[in-house]
């Protein structure tokens, strides 16, 4: 377990900023304590400093995880967000997409969101912008990347993809043995 290097921090913060923008500061400076990001086995964990100090007594090879896994670095040093970060990203999301009940199951199985399943989309969402996907009952289901801008979504055909799938809460079941 070690702090992130400057390059790792920059790559991770750029990825998170695609979803929550300048609200990134609210993740680190919280009123209930100081939180930080730590790297362990190529995975980035979001952990309170109090728990981090307790975990310092455990050897690195025995430590499985600590805090909440936000994502991992790939072998090419790109950062991939995990669905476990959804609970922390959803309240601060700038751009949101709501999908119809009929499209929820398709999204939770790992498929992209089609125009026919789109309920609402935040105004001024640009193309390739990170979005948090909600059900019509305002339950966060996952996150993705907008394939079309808000204006383009109005005039595309119903079978066009409007949100590229990145992660969803169905991964808890599909990848339960590898999710830490």
UniProtKB/Swiss-Prot annotation:
Principal localisation: nucleus
Which Pfam families does the entry mention? Answer: pre-PUA_NIP7 (PF17833), UPF0113 (PF03657)
Q: Which UniProt keyword terms apply here?
A: Nucleus, Ribosome biogenesis, RNA-binding
> What's a single GO CC term here?
nucleoplasm
Q: Where is this region: C-terminal domain?
A: 93-180
Q: Which residues form the PUA domain?
A: 94-170
Keyword Nucleus listed: yes
Q: Which family does it belong to?
A: Belongs to the NIP7 family.
Full protein name? 60S ribosome subunit biogenesis protein NIP7 homolog
The gene from which this protein is expressed is NIP7
């Amino acid at each position: 377990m070690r702090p992130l290097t400057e390059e790792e921090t920059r790559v991770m913060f750029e990825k998170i900023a695609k979803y929550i923008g300048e609200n990134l500061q609210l993740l680190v400076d919280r009123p209930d304590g100081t939180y930080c990001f730590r790297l362990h086995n190529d995975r980035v964990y979001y952990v309170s400093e109090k728990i981090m100090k307790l975990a310092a007594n455990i050897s690195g090879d025995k430590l499985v995880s600590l805090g909440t896994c936000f994502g991992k670095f790939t072998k090419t040093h790109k950062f991939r967000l995990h669905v476990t970060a959804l609970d922390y990203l959803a309240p601060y999301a700038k751009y949101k997409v709501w999908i119809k009940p009929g499209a929820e199951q398709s999204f939770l199985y790992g498929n992209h969101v089609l125009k026919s399943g789109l309920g609402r989309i935040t105004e001024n969402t640009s193309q390739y912008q990170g979005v948090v996907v909600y059900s019509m009952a305002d339950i966060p289901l996952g996150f993705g990347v907008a394939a079309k801008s808000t204006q383009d979504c109005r005039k595309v055909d119903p079978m066009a993809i409007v949100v590229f799938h990145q992660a969803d809460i169905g991964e808890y079941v599909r990848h339960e043995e590898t999710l830490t």
